[in-house]
Amino acid sequence: PKENAAGGDSFTYSAANSAGAVSLPATVTVTIEKTRSGVTYADTGEATATAAQDLAERGVFTGAKIGDKWYFEPDRTVSRGEFLAMVLETAGAEVTDVTMTGFRDDDAIPTWAKSYAAAGVAEGILRGKPTENGAVFSCEDPISFSEAATVLNRVLDLGDVELEVWFADREAVPSWAAQAVGNMEALNVLSVGSFG
């Protein structure tokens, strides 16, 4: 379709074999909707464009605008703070403005992330990294797949699977994340070997 076009179309078809048997008619309907967010990404292919657009329209993640183009940056590393914000926005968690989080590294947490950190603690999905002086959020650090699996596991809260059945690669993750990774594998959120 043309850029920024909207509308719909449909067609009906039947299939016939060499013996002359004809199938019942089937109808295919195609609907193209305009983006509600006004964001169209220059760096997403067909496979990821719809998911990226959905995140923007929900206000979960909009990427970066450079000049007059939007970039989703699918290969960019996501920080612990960014991941937590996306998860909480997607889950519809209540996020209220706060100035302090209770984490030992509170001064290093950007203002935009403090509310998400506090909400993550309140929702029971964020505990931080333990240190001898207390837990730190490490907001700007890249999130590992094991950490991401743990956060998602806590948000989804669907119960535990039998690790012997679902998790063939237990040695590849820290022990504290094994059950979460196994649970996410059982849900097809992660696949064996995709975590670190």
Predicted regions and their residues:
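Small side chains
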Residues: 5, 15-17, 63, 117-120
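Alpha-helix C-terminal capping/helix-coil junction sites
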Residues: 56, 117, 121-122, 185
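Acidic, turn/loop-rich segments in luminal/extracellular domains of secretory-pathway
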Residues: 1-34
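Feature responds to low-complexity, polar/acidic, surface-exposed segments characteristic
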Residues: 33-50, 57, 62-84, 88-115, ...
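Catalytic cores of secreted/periplasmic or lumenal enzymes
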Residues: 181
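Amphipathic alpha-helical interaction segments
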Residues: 19-21, 49, 111, 120, ...
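Proteins with a high burden of low-complexity, intrinsically disordered sequence enriched in S/T/G/P/A and R
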Residues: 1-2, 184, 189, 195-196
